[in-house]
Amino acid sequence: MRILVVLPSTSPSDRGPATLGPRAAILKNLRSMNTQPECDGGDILYGPGIEFQLAPNQDPVVQMILVVSDEDIGWLVIERIGRTLKWKFVDINTGDELVLSTN
């Protein structure tokens, strides 16, 4: 199992820290990629081989934890999400940023 931190790919501005976006938009975007909570209002979103852990009641969302439970399936989903939503993923054990393929 691998654990990553999900961060915005943009830098903070003078108006405050960069965010991943409004919670509702994140839920909508991830739902379109087969990743969603088990019940409305849930803070853990489940997808193929992955789960996102959101901080309770955080809006806008600054960062999330991403747990990769099935590496064979999960990496394809992570690459699609990262490219589509322009997020970056950092390994919490090494501090290395995940480099997504450019296909």
Model regions: which residues?
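Acidic (Asp/Glu-rich) sequence patches and key acidic residues
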Residues: M1-N103
